[in-house]
């Protein structure tokens, strides 16, 4: 069985992430979306919320699993018996960092491969940070995040939106 792992913070998941997940799910028998617990970051959505948002977003993909992990990605890969890391690239600027990480992972575990997938060009500008910024100021994020989770993301990120929803 070919198992791939697509790791990330996904705070929150964007349409760019979903684009990579859907395309990578066609390559592997099983794709694990690995949600990182990063002690150096303070996410807006806690780990359980991020896992749940991703499960909702990917429920139409039967070979996709969503799991949280902390520590080294290589250790998670071994635990899951996976051999391929999937990394999404928006622009050339993403490549340098991701290339260094791929080399480090290869050094730590020579049997692990990394594949790079370019996101659809219509999402090349998109990041979770940008989604959070737009939502905080009440902007429309419906084209930025999966439709199923847009209201939840807005509710969490925009107090005004949350108050309007509660008063309905």
Curated annotation (Swiss-Prot):
GO molecular function, one term: ATP binding
GO biological process: coenzyme A biosynthetic process
CC cofactor: Mg(2+)
Ligand binding (ATP): 9-10, 17, 88-90, 98, 123-129
Keyword terms: ATP-binding, Coenzyme A biosynthesis, Cytoplasm, Magnesium, Nucleotide-binding, Nucleotidyltransferase, Transferase
Subunit field text: Homohexamer.
Protein name in the entry: Phosphopantetheine adenylyltransferase
Annotated source species: Caldicellulosiruptor saccharolyticus (strain ATCC 43494 / DSM 8903 / Tp8T 6331)
């Amino acid at each position: 069985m070919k198992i791939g792992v697509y790791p990330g913070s996904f705070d929150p998941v964007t349409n760019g992430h979903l684009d990579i997940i859907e395309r990578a799910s066609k390559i592997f028998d099983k794709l694990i979306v690995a949600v990182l617990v990063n002690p150096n970051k303070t996410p807006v959505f806690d780990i359980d919320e991020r896992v749940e948002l991703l499960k909702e977003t990917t429920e139409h993909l039967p070979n996709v699993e969503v799991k949280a992990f902390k520590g080294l990605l290589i250790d998670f890969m071994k635990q899951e018996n996976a051999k391929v890391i999937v990394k999404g690239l928006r622009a050339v600027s993403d490549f340098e960092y991701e290339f260094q990480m791929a080399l480090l992972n290869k050094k730590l575990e020579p049997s692990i491969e990394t594949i790079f997938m370019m996101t659809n060009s219509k999402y090349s500008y998109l990041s979770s940070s940008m989604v959070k910024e737009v939502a905080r100021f009440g902007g429309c994020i419906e084209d930025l995040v999966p439709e199923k989770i847009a209201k939840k993301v807005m509710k969490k990120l925009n107090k005004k939106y949350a108050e309007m929803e509660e008063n309905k």
